[in-house]
Amino acid sequence: MPAAGFRLSSRALFVDNAFGGVKIFRMKFEKIDPKSVAENSAKLIGSDWMLVCAGDRGGFNMMTASWGAFGFMWNMPAFFVFVRPSRYTYEFMESRDFFTVNILPESRRDALNICGSRSGRDCDKAAAAGLTPEFTENGVYFAEARLVFECRKAYSQMMEAGSFADKTLVEKWYAASDFHKMYVGVVERALAAK
């Protein structure tokens, strides 16, 4: 008979019983004021990366992103995320009023790599990345995240070549004219892992 044991991930305690079953005790989140996040947002997004997710129980997709911003707009905390129309996540961003920004711990960099290199059109990215979706009234976030921001879409606009003051950016990043769409999401709820 196998011995019982346990292991701890960044978001859950897994208890293996003597009969081969596994019980999962999820760690909880606490609601926080988004203005209390003291981390450098340039590092949080540009180096640590974020997982942008939109959808619901009926279907969702997420993508790894390292371009964006977390700041203050219209007197409210807000995220600025950029999604190309060619991305599967774009369909969900367009058809939903909310999206989430998930910040995973460094120990889950593998999940970010998977979500940034595979398409949800071709596979179940959450399963492939070992991520556990949690559903709210407005969308989806992941149990493995250390920070979650649930954002209500307030503004969106396609980027255009003519709007760039620095034309070298168009040459460098948009030679194929595959411009991003910018979404400004007002943070309606922020959660931190306990």
Language model features by range: what are they?
Residues 23-194:
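Basic, polyanion-binding surface patches
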